[in-house]
Design a protein with these regions (language model features):
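N-terminal localization/anchoring segments of enzymes in phospholipid and broader phosphate metabolism
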Residues: 1-406, 424, 428, 440-464, ...
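Hydrophobic alpha/beta core scaffold segments
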Residues: 431-435
């Protein structure tokens, strides 16, 4: 009775049902919005298709019932009372549906150089909402003929139709999380990013970086030292310039605010804002406007390449000497995701690295790519080839009977050249360990091919996002942190930066992190020689690597 009254009083007056026919063409279905679809039968037996949009600002999606802690979704309520809406028809079948539309737009191919690039991207985002459907989801089983009719209207192949059991959009959970707090077992234990033991509180950041390279590990350690780094740079009279790449930033970003402060304080501020960061385009367009209005020089990347690197360079002039402070990260400059994703942030006053970072920014300013650096690995022209060269070094060592090793931590591995070279390394006897969360196009453990390769994936509370490359052992060992996965889109079609870690303590820290991830027996899955992933069994003490890293960060602060 309560639901019926709610439907009749709150929902029925504002919904807009449509019956598809000669005068009512099949409506445009918006991307990721929910619709109720119904097969109607007239008294003469003729069938028609009815559609009701279920996303409406006129009513709440989550309907709270009188019984405490009980809810119903508005779309399910609409579906239930569809006979009341189409009362002149018999209801033959009904379902909730959702269409996913293509989000890929080739901005470079469509761009007209006579147009302002930012305005062009803003217009392109509007166009994306009308791209072709790539998926149709249904919550109820429907007759094949009806599904075919929907596919015809949407110009979609039936292979891309999926029936799902769960609600089509789970975002309603955020609305009830405060109520659910009364049931603590439904939630993770609270984890607060800890202070980094590598930085001394209350002291300027720059002298500490000059004294020794630093490494922050998110989300176990706080992003605050990096924020302090930017804040100090914005206000330090000796700072000449700040240069930075931005790919995805928070909607309320202290990082961007500090860049604005720096420009207003008379610093030279160069910011590369990647307007092609998918689904962040609108946010980036808005920030680019604010940065430009504050006096920052804003550039938008390269024709044909996305700039995905996480690079920041602060240049100081102290007592007539130029100093370079470089920060290189594996993840975005985003305060929100720094609490949710595992990432690394490396800071150094190494002059040679600083000069190469300056070379990267100079190339980006001139719409060019870097092709000659000694320390950094910079895609698209000198990351893949240097990685292949380092794998070759391990192959040569293995053939000479020496210990050879490769350790890789990343999100995905799809680059065929690198995969082929890793297979060659395995065949030569190089031991290879890989922690790859997502796509891995290399199958390990195949006799005569990849028997020396071990692949595991860790999916835990935090999204594994850091990239670590390890080549060699002992005095030959090279360790890098990077923004790039080994996918051709990263190695050949993006500007990416990998940084060498020379500090012995930081190298050891990264090695220990990698070994811990290889020992995870709670959230890890091991890939077998058939490409299947199996749970890594806990043979000894249970080890959740993410929990371990947090406990380590907490212990370092409290000791």
């Amino acid at each position: 009775e309560y639901l019926e009254k709610y439907f009749l009083n709150e929902i029925a007056p504002v919904i807009s049902p449509t019956i598809v026919g000669k005068r009512q063409p099949f409506p445009f279905l918006k991307n990721n919005e929910i619709y109720a679809v119904v097969v109607l039968q007239t008294k003469s037996g003729k069938e028609k298709l009815g559609i009701i949009p279920c996303s409406n600002t006129g009513f709440k999606r989550l309907v709270e019932l009188p019984t405490a802690g009980t809810y119903m979704l508005a779309e399910e309520l609409i579906l239930h009372y569809i006979p009341e809406v189409f009362e002149r028809y018999n209801i033959k079948a009904k379902s909730l549906i959702r269409v996913t539309r293509n989000a890929d737009i080739d901005a470079d191919a469509l761009y007209d150089e006579d147009l302002d690039y930012r305005d062009f991207m803003a217009e392109l985002i509007k166009r994306r909402k009308k791209l072709a459907p790539v998926r149709l989801e249904l919550t109820r089983e429907m007759d094949g003929e009806i599904v075919d009719v929907l596919c015809d209207y949407l110009e979609l192949d039936s292979d891309y139709v999926f029936q799902v059991q769960a609600p089509l959009d789970l975002s309603f959970v955020f609305e009830i999380q405060d109520t659910l707090r009364k049931t603590p077992e439904l939630f993770y234990e609270k984890r607060v990013p800890q202070k980094s033991s590598q930085f001394r509180d209350g002291e300027p950041v720059f002298p500490q970086i000059r004294e020794k390279d630093k490494l922050l590990s998110y989300p176990y350690e706080s992003m605050k030292p990096f924020l302090n780094f930017l804040r100090e740079a914005a206000n330090d009279k000796e700072v000449i310039s700040i240069k930075m790449t931005l790919y995805r930033v928070a909607k309320h970003s202290k990082i961007v605010e500090y860049l604005i402060d720096a420009a207003e304080n008379g610093k030279e501020v160069l910011v590369l804002v990647e307007l092609k960061a998918r689904f962040d385009e609108e946010n980036n367009i808005e920030w680019s406007r604010r940065l430009e209005d504050a006096g920052c020089r804003v550039i938008y990347g390269l024709d044909g390449y996305k700039v995905h690197s996480k690079l920041c360079l602060v240049t100081k002039k102290s007592e007539g000497q130029v100093e370079y402070y470089t920060q290189i990260g594996t993840g975005n400059y985003n305060e929100k995701t720094a609490r949710l994703y595992t990432d690394l942030s490396f800071m150094t006053a190494n002059v040679e690295i600083g000069l190469e970072a300056a070379k990267v920014f100079q190339a980006l300013s001139m719409e060019e790519t870097v092709d000659n650096v000694q320390h950094l690995l910079v895609a698209p022209r000198c990351l893949q080839n240097k990685v292949l060269s380092m794998i070759d070094e391990e192959i040569a060592c293995a053939k000479e009977g020496k210990e050879a090793y490769i350790g890789l931590k990343m999100n995905s591995l799809t680059d065929k050249k690198i995969i082929d070279k890793l297979i060659e390394a395995s065949q030569a006897g190089v031991k290879i360990d890989m922690v790859i969360r997502g796509i891995c196009c290399l199958i390990p453990g195949v006799k005569g091919k990849t028997e020396n390769i071990r692949v595991r994936s860790i999916v835990g509370r935090f999204l594994e996002h850091s990239r670590i490359y390890i080549f060699g052992t002992q005095e030959r060992e090279k360790v890098y942190i990077a923004s790039a996965d080994f996918m051709t889109r990263n190695t050949l079609r993006r500007v990416e930066v990998a940084a060498p870690v020379y500090d012995k303590d930081l190298k050891m820290q990264l090695e220990e992190m990698f070994i811990t991830m290889l020992s995870d027996n709670q959230k890890a899955r091991q890939e077998d020689s058939r490409g299947n992933y199996e749970i890594a069994e806990a043979q000894e003490t249970p080890l959740n690597s993410q929990e371990f890293f947090y406990e380590q960060a907490y212990m370092r602060v409290t000791i």
